[in-house]
Protein backbone atom coordinates (compact mmCIF):
# COMPACT_ATOMS: atom_id res chain seq x y z
CA UNK A 1 0.00 0.00 0.00
CA UNK A 2 1.49 3.31 -1.09
CA UNK A 3 1.22 6.08 1.49
CA UNK A 4 0.17 9.63 0.70
CA UNK A 5 3.74 10.85 1.23
CA UNK A 6 5.09 8.19 -1.13
CA UNK A 7 2.54 9.30 -3.72
CA UNK A 8 3.75 12.89 -3.35
CA UNK A 9 7.36 11.74 -3.68
CA UNK A 10 6.55 9.77 -6.84
CA UNK A 11 4.64 12.74 -8.28
CA UNK A 12 7.51 15.16 -7.62
CA UNK A 13 10.13 12.78 -8.99
CA UNK A 14 8.16 12.35 -12.22
CA UNK A 15 7.50 16.08 -12.58
CA UNK A 16 11.16 16.91 -11.95
CA UNK A 17 12.49 14.18 -14.21
CA UNK A 18 10.18 15.07 -17.11
CA UNK A 19 11.32 18.69 -16.81
CA UNK A 20 15.08 18.14 -16.42
CA UNK A 21 15.88 14.57 -17.46
CA UNK A 22 17.99 14.25 -14.29
CA UNK A 23 17.64 11.72 -11.43
CA UNK A 24 15.95 13.18 -8.35
CA UNK A 25 17.38 12.87 -4.83
CA UNK A 26 16.08 13.44 -1.32
CA UNK A 27 17.54 16.95 -1.08
CA UNK A 28 15.57 18.13 -4.12
CA UNK A 29 12.39 16.57 -2.74
CA UNK A 30 12.85 18.42 0.56
CA UNK A 31 13.29 21.67 -1.39
CA UNK A 32 10.07 20.92 -3.27
CA UNK A 33 8.02 20.58 -0.09
CA UNK A 34 8.32 17.06 1.30
CA UNK A 35 8.35 17.85 5.04
CA UNK A 36 10.35 14.85 6.23
CA UNK A 37 13.94 14.07 7.02
CA UNK A 38 16.35 13.04 4.31
CA UNK A 39 16.52 9.54 5.81
CA UNK A 40 12.73 9.14 5.77
CA UNK A 41 12.54 10.29 2.15
CA UNK A 42 15.29 7.87 1.14
CA UNK A 43 13.39 5.04 2.83
CA UNK A 44 10.24 5.98 0.91
CA UNK A 45 12.20 6.12 -2.34
CA UNK A 46 13.59 2.66 -1.60
CA UNK A 47 10.06 1.38 -0.96
CA UNK A 48 8.84 2.87 -4.26
CA UNK A 49 11.77 1.18 -5.99
CA UNK A 50 10.77 -2.15 -4.44
CA UNK A 51 7.20 -1.60 -5.68
CA UNK A 52 8.69 -1.24 -9.17
CA UNK A 53 7.65 2.41 -9.54
CA UNK A 54 11.15 3.93 -9.41
CA UNK A 55 14.55 2.88 -10.73
CA UNK A 56 18.05 3.73 -9.55
CA UNK A 57 20.75 4.86 -11.96
CA UNK A 58 24.38 3.79 -11.67
CA UNK A 59 25.68 7.35 -11.86
CA UNK A 60 23.52 8.92 -9.14
CA UNK A 61 21.95 8.22 -5.78
CA UNK A 62 18.76 9.80 -7.12
CA UNK A 63 15.86 7.93 -8.70
CA UNK A 64 14.07 8.02 -12.03
CA UNK A 65 10.57 6.76 -12.88
CA UNK A 66 10.03 3.26 -14.25
CA UNK A 67 7.38 2.41 -16.88
CA UNK A 68 5.15 1.19 -14.03
CA UNK A 69 5.80 4.46 -12.20
CA UNK A 70 4.61 6.48 -15.17
CA UNK A 71 1.52 4.28 -15.43
CA UNK A 72 0.70 4.76 -11.73
CA UNK A 73 1.18 8.51 -12.11
CA UNK A 74 -1.12 8.73 -15.15
CA UNK A 75 -3.81 6.58 -13.49
CA UNK A 76 -3.78 8.10 -10.00
CA UNK A 77 -1.82 11.35 -9.73
CA UNK A 78 -2.05 13.25 -13.01
CA UNK A 79 -3.67 16.69 -12.87
CA UNK A 80 -3.99 18.29 -16.33
CA UNK A 81 -2.24 21.61 -16.80
CA UNK A 82 -4.27 24.40 -18.38
CA UNK A 83 -3.04 25.45 -21.81
CA UNK A 84 -1.18 28.74 -21.81
CA UNK A 85 -2.89 31.66 -23.51
CA UNK A 86 -0.15 32.03 -26.16
CA UNK A 87 -0.48 28.34 -27.13
CA UNK A 88 -4.26 28.63 -27.42
CA UNK A 89 -3.85 31.75 -29.55
CA UNK A 90 -1.35 29.93 -31.76
CA UNK A 91 -3.75 27.00 -32.26
CA UNK A 92 -6.62 29.29 -33.23
CA UNK A 93 -4.46 31.37 -35.57
CA UNK A 94 -3.25 28.21 -37.33
CA UNK A 95 -6.83 27.08 -37.82
CA UNK A 96 -7.88 30.58 -38.91
CA UNK A 97 -6.63 30.32 -42.49
CA UNK A 98 -8.80 29.38 -45.47
CA UNK A 99 -9.18 25.65 -46.13
CA UNK A 100 -10.44 24.14 -49.39
CA UNK A 101 -11.34 20.65 -48.14
CA UNK A 102 -11.64 18.67 -44.92
CA UNK A 103 -8.35 16.83 -45.44
CA UNK A 104 -6.55 20.20 -45.44
CA UNK A 105 -7.81 20.80 -41.90
CA UNK A 106 -6.89 17.29 -40.73
CA UNK A 107 -3.42 17.59 -42.28
CA UNK A 108 -2.88 21.01 -40.70
CA UNK A 109 -3.95 19.71 -37.28
CA UNK A 110 -1.12 17.14 -37.31
CA UNK A 111 1.39 19.83 -38.24
CA UNK A 112 0.19 22.23 -35.52
CA UNK A 113 0.24 19.57 -32.80
CA UNK A 114 3.73 18.47 -33.81
CA UNK A 115 5.05 22.05 -33.81
CA UNK A 116 3.55 22.74 -30.37
CA UNK A 117 5.20 19.69 -28.78
CA UNK A 118 8.20 18.73 -30.97
CA UNK A 119 6.76 15.19 -30.96
CA UNK A 120 5.33 13.11 -33.79
CA UNK A 121 1.62 13.87 -34.25
CA UNK A 122 -1.14 11.91 -35.97
CA UNK A 123 -4.56 13.04 -37.13
CA UNK A 124 -7.42 10.94 -38.47
CA UNK A 125 -10.61 12.61 -39.70
CA UNK A 126 -14.23 11.70 -38.90
CA UNK A 127 -15.14 8.17 -39.94
CA UNK A 128 -15.40 7.25 -43.58
CA UNK A 129 -18.65 5.36 -42.97
CA UNK A 130 -20.48 8.65 -42.36
CA UNK A 131 -19.83 9.90 -45.91
CA UNK A 132 -21.76 9.73 -49.17
CA UNK A 133 -20.32 9.57 -52.66
CA UNK A 134 -21.53 12.78 -54.32
CA UNK A 135 -19.45 13.04 -57.47
CA UNK A 136 -17.24 11.05 -59.83
CA UNK A 137 -15.35 12.14 -62.94
CA UNK A 138 -12.61 10.73 -65.13
CA UNK A 139 -10.30 13.02 -67.09
CA UNK A 140 -8.16 11.31 -69.78
CA UNK A 141 -4.52 12.37 -69.61
CA UNK A 142 -3.23 10.28 -72.52
CA UNK A 143 -3.99 6.95 -74.21
CA UNK A 144 -3.12 4.89 -71.16
CA UNK A 145 -3.69 7.17 -68.14
CA UNK A 146 -6.75 8.77 -66.59
CA UNK A 147 -7.29 11.12 -63.64
CA UNK A 148 -10.14 9.93 -61.40
CA UNK A 149 -11.83 12.55 -59.20
CA UNK A 150 -14.00 11.33 -56.31
CA UNK A 151 -16.04 13.73 -54.19
CA UNK A 152 -17.92 13.02 -50.95
CA UNK A 153 -20.49 15.11 -49.11
CA UNK A 154 -18.11 15.73 -46.22
CA UNK A 155 -15.91 18.03 -48.23
CA UNK A 156 -13.38 15.40 -49.24
CA UNK A 157 -11.96 15.34 -52.75
CA UNK A 158 -9.77 12.44 -53.85
CA UNK A 159 -7.93 12.53 -57.15
CA UNK A 160 -5.34 10.15 -58.48
CA UNK A 161 -3.82 9.06 -61.76
CA UNK A 162 -4.52 5.48 -62.84
CA UNK A 163 -3.00 3.33 -65.58
CA UNK A 164 -5.62 1.92 -67.94
CA UNK A 165 -5.34 -1.79 -68.87
CA UNK A 166 -4.66 -2.34 -72.57
CA UNK A 167 -7.98 -4.17 -73.02
CA UNK A 168 -10.00 -1.17 -71.75
CA UNK A 169 -11.09 1.35 -74.40
CA UNK A 170 -12.16 4.99 -74.05
CA UNK A 171 -15.75 3.83 -74.67
CA UNK A 172 -15.37 1.43 -71.74
CA UNK A 173 -14.26 4.30 -69.50
CA UNK A 174 -17.26 6.40 -70.53
CA UNK A 175 -19.56 3.49 -69.73
CA UNK A 176 -17.81 2.96 -66.41
CA UNK A 177 -18.35 6.62 -65.47
CA UNK A 178 -22.03 6.32 -66.40
CA UNK A 179 -22.47 3.19 -64.24
CA UNK A 180 -20.82 4.85 -61.25
CA UNK A 181 -22.97 7.97 -61.61
CA UNK A 182 -26.18 5.97 -62.14
CA UNK A 183 -25.68 3.28 -59.51
CA UNK A 184 -23.33 4.67 -56.87
CA UNK A 185 -23.29 8.48 -56.73
CA UNK A 186 -25.61 9.71 -53.99
CA UNK A 187 -25.20 6.55 -51.93
CA UNK A 188 -23.47 6.20 -48.53
CA UNK A 189 -19.96 4.82 -48.88
CA UNK A 190 -20.96 1.67 -47.00
CA UNK A 191 -23.64 1.06 -49.65
CA UNK A 192 -21.10 1.77 -52.39
CA UNK A 193 -18.73 -0.75 -50.82
CA UNK A 194 -21.50 -3.37 -50.61
CA UNK A 195 -22.60 -2.83 -54.23
CA UNK A 196 -19.00 -3.14 -55.45
CA UNK A 197 -19.07 -6.66 -53.99
CA UNK A 198 -22.57 -7.69 -55.17
CA UNK A 199 -24.44 -5.72 -57.83
CA UNK A 200 -21.61 -4.06 -59.78
CA UNK A 201 -19.80 -7.29 -60.86
CA UNK A 202 -23.05 -8.53 -62.47
CA UNK A 203 -23.51 -5.23 -64.30
CA UNK A 204 -19.93 -5.34 -65.58
CA UNK A 205 -20.41 -8.89 -66.90
CA UNK A 206 -23.39 -7.59 -68.84
CA UNK A 207 -21.60 -4.65 -70.47
CA UNK A 208 -17.93 -5.57 -70.88
CA UNK A 209 -16.00 -8.29 -72.66
CA UNK A 210 -13.25 -8.13 -70.00
CA UNK A 211 -15.20 -7.56 -66.75
CA UNK A 212 -12.29 -8.61 -64.53
CA UNK A 213 -10.10 -5.76 -65.76
CA UNK A 214 -12.92 -3.27 -65.27
CA UNK A 215 -13.71 -4.64 -61.81
CA UNK A 216 -10.09 -4.21 -60.77
CA UNK A 217 -10.18 -0.63 -62.03
CA UNK A 218 -13.45 0.01 -60.14
CA UNK A 219 -11.91 -1.36 -56.96
CA UNK A 220 -8.69 0.57 -57.40
CA UNK A 221 -10.40 3.89 -58.03
CA UNK A 222 -13.22 3.76 -55.50
CA UNK A 223 -11.04 2.06 -52.90
CA UNK A 224 -9.41 5.43 -52.22
CA UNK A 225 -12.74 6.77 -50.99
CA UNK A 226 -12.78 4.14 -48.23
CA UNK A 227 -9.24 4.70 -47.01
CA UNK A 228 -8.91 6.29 -43.61
CA UNK A 229 -6.13 8.78 -44.19
CA UNK A 230 -3.78 9.25 -41.27
CA UNK A 231 -1.85 12.50 -41.53
CA UNK A 232 1.49 12.62 -39.74
CA UNK A 233 3.30 15.72 -38.53
CA UNK A 234 6.91 15.73 -37.38
CA UNK A 235 7.95 12.26 -38.57
CA UNK A 236 11.61 13.13 -38.10
CA UNK A 237 11.02 14.10 -34.46
CA UNK A 238 11.15 10.38 -33.69
CA UNK A 239 14.90 10.56 -34.21
CA UNK A 240 15.20 12.92 -31.24
CA UNK A 241 13.89 10.45 -28.70
CA UNK A 242 13.24 6.79 -28.12
CA UNK A 243 14.91 5.43 -31.25
CA UNK A 244 18.23 3.75 -30.64
CA UNK A 245 20.71 4.77 -33.29
CA UNK A 246 20.49 1.45 -35.09
CA UNK A 247 20.18 1.72 -38.87
CA UNK A 248 17.89 -1.31 -39.19
CA UNK A 249 15.54 -0.01 -36.52
CA UNK A 250 15.49 3.41 -38.18
CA UNK A 251 14.54 1.76 -41.47
CA UNK A 252 11.78 -0.23 -39.76
CA UNK A 253 10.35 2.84 -38.06
CA UNK A 254 10.45 4.84 -41.31
CA UNK A 255 8.64 2.02 -43.13
CA UNK A 256 6.08 1.83 -40.33
CA UNK A 257 5.41 5.56 -40.58
CA UNK A 258 4.63 5.21 -44.31
CA UNK A 259 2.07 2.42 -43.79
CA UNK A 260 -1.42 3.92 -43.54
CA UNK A 261 -3.02 0.64 -42.43
CA UNK A 262 -0.50 0.20 -39.61
CA UNK A 263 -0.99 3.79 -38.46
CA UNK A 264 -4.78 3.46 -38.54
CA UNK A 265 -4.52 0.31 -36.43
CA UNK A 266 -2.20 2.14 -34.03
CA UNK A 267 -4.76 4.92 -33.51
CA UNK A 268 -7.94 2.86 -33.35
CA UNK A 269 -9.38 1.02 -30.39
CA UNK A 270 -7.84 2.91 -27.49
CA UNK A 271 -9.74 6.12 -26.70
CA UNK A 272 -13.52 5.80 -26.23
CA UNK A 273 -16.50 8.04 -25.54
CA UNK A 274 -16.17 7.25 -21.82
CA UNK A 275 -12.39 7.75 -21.88
CA UNK A 276 -11.72 10.18 -24.75
CA UNK A 277 -8.04 10.63 -23.81
CA UNK A 278 -5.81 7.61 -23.23
CA UNK A 279 -2.09 7.24 -22.52
CA UNK A 280 -0.26 4.10 -23.60
CA UNK A 281 3.21 3.70 -22.15
CA UNK A 282 6.00 1.49 -23.49
CA UNK A 283 4.84 -2.04 -24.30
CA UNK A 284 1.18 -0.95 -23.95
CA UNK A 285 1.47 0.63 -27.41
CA UNK A 286 1.67 -2.89 -28.81
CA UNK A 287 4.55 -2.33 -31.20
CA UNK A 288 8.11 -3.44 -30.48
CA UNK A 289 9.51 -0.47 -32.41
CA UNK A 290 7.80 1.94 -30.02
CA UNK A 291 8.34 0.19 -26.69
CA UNK A 292 10.56 3.00 -25.36
CA UNK A 293 7.93 5.66 -26.04
CA UNK A 294 4.57 6.91 -24.78
CA UNK A 295 1.52 7.69 -26.85
CA UNK A 296 -1.50 9.82 -26.02
CA UNK A 297 -4.60 9.23 -28.15
CA UNK A 298 -7.71 11.40 -28.06
CA UNK A 299 -11.04 11.24 -29.85
CA UNK A 300 -13.10 14.24 -30.89
CA UNK A 301 -16.66 14.38 -32.15
CA UNK A 302 -18.20 16.62 -34.79
CA UNK A 303 -21.97 16.68 -34.32
CA UNK A 304 -23.67 14.77 -37.12
CA UNK A 305 -20.39 13.89 -38.81
CA UNK A 306 -18.81 11.23 -36.63
CA UNK A 307 -15.63 10.94 -34.60
CA UNK A 308 -11.98 11.46 -35.41
CA UNK A 309 -8.72 10.84 -33.60
CA UNK A 310 -5.56 12.77 -32.81
CA UNK A 311 -2.45 11.34 -31.17
CA UNK A 312 1.07 12.21 -30.05
CA UNK A 313 4.04 9.86 -29.92
CA UNK A 314 6.88 11.00 -27.69
CA UNK A 315 9.38 9.93 -25.04
CA UNK A 316 8.22 8.16 -21.88
CA UNK A 317 9.59 11.21 -20.06
CA UNK A 318 7.05 13.54 -21.67
CA UNK A 319 5.40 16.07 -19.28
CA UNK A 320 2.15 14.12 -18.97
CA UNK A 321 0.07 16.81 -17.21
CA UNK A 322 0.99 19.47 -19.78
CA UNK A 323 0.48 17.13 -22.75
CA UNK A 324 -2.90 15.95 -21.42
CA UNK A 325 -4.12 19.54 -21.05
CA UNK A 326 -2.84 20.51 -24.49
CA UNK A 327 -4.37 17.52 -26.28
CA UNK A 328 -7.71 18.00 -24.50
CA UNK A 329 -7.87 21.64 -25.60
CA UNK A 330 -6.66 20.80 -29.09
CA UNK A 331 -9.32 18.14 -29.74
CA UNK A 332 -12.08 20.61 -28.86
CA UNK A 333 -10.56 23.32 -31.09
CA UNK A 334 -10.26 20.85 -33.99
CA UNK A 335 -13.87 19.67 -33.56
CA UNK A 336 -15.01 23.30 -33.54
CA UNK A 337 -13.04 24.09 -36.70
CA UNK A 338 -14.46 21.05 -38.52
CA UNK A 339 -17.97 21.90 -37.35
CA UNK A 340 -17.62 25.42 -38.76
CA UNK A 341 -16.40 24.01 -42.07
CA UNK A 342 -19.31 21.57 -42.37
CA UNK A 343 -21.77 24.38 -41.62
CA UNK A 344 -20.10 26.45 -44.34
CA UNK A 345 -20.70 23.55 -46.76
CA UNK A 346 -24.32 23.34 -45.63
CA UNK A 347 -23.91 19.77 -44.32
Swiss-Prot record:
Q: What domain of life does the native source organism fall in?
A: Bacteria
Query: What keywords sit in the KW lines?
Result: Repressor, Stress response, Transcription, Transcription regulation
Is-annotated flag, keyword Electron transport?
A: no
Kindly give the InterPro entries that the UniProt entry links to this protein. GAF-like_dom_sf, HrcA, HrcA_C, WH-like_DNA-bd_sf, WH_DNA-bd_sf, WHTH_transcript_rep_HrcA_IDD
| Gene3D superfamilies xrefs | 3.30.450.40, Heat-inducible transcription repressor hrca homolog, domain 3, Winged helix-like DNA-binding domain superfamily/Winged helix DNA-binding domain
Q: Which GO terms describe its biological process?
A: negative regulation of DNA-templated transcription
Output the Pfam families linked to this UniProt entry. Answer: HrcA
Provide a Gene Ontology MF annotation, just one: DNA binding
State the disulfide connectivity: none
Q: Which SUPFAM superfamilies match?
A: GAF domain-like, Winged helix' DNA-binding domain
Q: What does this protein do?
A: Negative regulator of class I heat shock genes (grpE-dnaK-dnaJ and groELS operons). Prevents heat-shock induction of these operons.
Annotated family = Belongs to the HrcA family.
Q: NCBIfam families under this entry?
A: hrcA (TIGR00331)
The protein's name: Heat-inducible transcription repressor HrcA
Organism source for this protein? Answer: Enterococcus faecalis (strain ATCC 700802 / V583)
Q: Which gene encodes it?
A: hrcA
